[in-house]
A protein has these predicted regions:
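Multi-pass alpha-helical membrane architecture of UbiA-family
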Residues: 1-306
C-alpha cells in the first residue's frame, strides 16, 4: 500500500459528505474513515491483476517480490472493501448498489488499462462513484441535486482531476507497460501527445473551480467563505500549472514523479476548496489534513514512485 495516496480517496469522501451540512461527529468520522481506507484496499485489489507490469516498474513492492501471497492480498482487499461499502450502505442503502458497481470496476480495471482510450476515464468513474457514495451517505438523499452549482462542479473536478492523476501516473511505467503489452496512451502515442491530453484534463479540472467560486461571489455568497475557498483554489491551480510544466519536460520514466507529485497536490487542494464552500468550519481541519499528507509523502521509501 501507498498510505499517502489514501488522502486522495479521503478528500474525495470529504467533498462528498460536505454537502450534508450538519452531521454528528461519529457519522463524519465513520464516512471519512472508510473513504480514506478505500484507496488502500482498492489499490491492493487492482495490484493483484497487474503483477506483470508492476514487476518491471516497481520490483521493490512486497507483492511483486513474492513476499506476500497474491491470494492473501485478494482476500484482505475484498474484505476491506466490503467493510467500507457496508458502512456507507448503513447510512444510505443505495450505496450497496453503487458499491457493487465500484467493486466491479476495480476488478476489471486492468483489462481497460490495456486500452489507450479507456484507462484514465475508467479509473475516474470509479472514484466518482466514491464521491457519490459519500454524498449519499452524508445527506441521506435518494437523488443527486445537479442544479446545485457546487455539486455539478465537483463531478467535473473529481472526474477530470483524477483522470489527470492516472494519466500522469502512466508516465512512470511506459517501458514496463510496453514490455507487457499495456497499450496505455503514452505507450500508443508517446509522451508529447499524452502530455497535451493531460493539459486538457488539467484545464477541465481547474476551470469549474473558479467558475463556481466567482459565480457564488457575484451572487452575494459570504466573502469570508469565498476567501477561505480561494486559499485552496489558488494553491491547487499553482500545483496544476507546476504539474503540466513538469510533465512537458519528462523524457524518462524515472523523471515522471516530478509531475505526478504536484498532480496529487492539485487534486487534494482543488477538492478542498469546494468542500470549504459547503462547510467553512472545515478550513483548519483540511489544512491539518493536507499537512499530514505532506509528512507521509516526505517519508515515502521510494521517491520515484507515487
Amino acid at each position: 500500500m501507498r498510505p499517502y495516496l489514501m488522502f486522495v480517496s479521503g478528500i474525495t469522501g470529504v467533498l462528498g459528505m460536505s454537502f450534508a451540512g450538519e452531521m454528528s461527529l461519529l457519522k463524519t468520522l465513520m464516512i471519512f474513515k472508510v473513504t480514506f481506507l478505500s484507496y488502500g484496499f482498492g489499490q491492493a485489489l487492482t495490484d493483484c491483476f497487474q503483477i506483470d507490469t508492476d514487476s518491471l516498474s516497481s520490483p521493490y513492492r512486497p507483492l511483486t517480490q513474492g513476499v506476500v501471497d497474491k491470494n492473501h492480498f485478494l482476500i484482505v482487499s475484498s474484505v476491506g472493501l466490503l467493510y467500507c461499502v457496508s458502512v456507507l450502505a448503513f447510512y444510505n442503502p443505495l450505496n450497496l448498489l453503487l458499491g457493487v458497481l465500484a467493486g466491479f470496476g476495480l476488478a476489471t480495471y486492468t483489462t481497460f488499462k490495456r486500452k489507450w482510450w479507456a484507462g484514465p476515464f475508467y479509473n475516474s468513474w470509479i472514484v466518482l462513484v466514491l464521491f457519490l457514495m459519500a454524498y449519499l451517505a452524508g445527506t441521506g438523499r435518494t437523488h443527486f441535486d445537479l442544479s446545485n452549482l457546487i455539486f455539478s462542479a465537483s463531478i467535473l473536478i473529481v472526474f477530470f482531476g483524477y483522470a489527470n492523476f492516472v494519466l500522469t501516473g502512466y508516465f512512470k511505467d511506459i517501458e514496463a507497460d510496453r514490455a507487457t503489452n499495456y497499450k496505455t496512451l503514452p505507450v500508443k502515442f508517446g509522451r508529447r501527445i499524452s502530455t497535451i491530453v493531460s493539459d486538457v484534463f488539467g484545464i477541465a479540472a481547474s476551470i469549474p473551480v473558479f467558475v463556481t467560486i466567482f459565480s457564488l461571489a457575484f451572487d452575494s455568497f459570504p466573502y469570508q467563505i469565498i476567501l477561505k475557498a480561494l486559499v485552496f483554489a489558488y494553491a491547487g491551480i499553482a500545483a496544476t500549472i507546476f504539474t503540466q510544466l513538469n510533465l512537458h519536460s519528462v523524457s524518462r520514466d524515472s523523471e515522471a514523479h516530478q509531475a505526478i507529485v504536484p498532480c496529487v497536490h492539485s487534486y487534494i487542494l482543488l477538492l478542498s476548496s469546494l468542500a470549504i464552500l459547503n462547510n467553512p468550519d472545515w478550513f483548519i481541519p483540511l489544512i491539518v489534513f493536507y499537512l499530514f499528507y505532506l509528512v507521509l509523502l516526505k517519508i515515502r521509501p521510494a521517491k520515484e514512485q507515487i
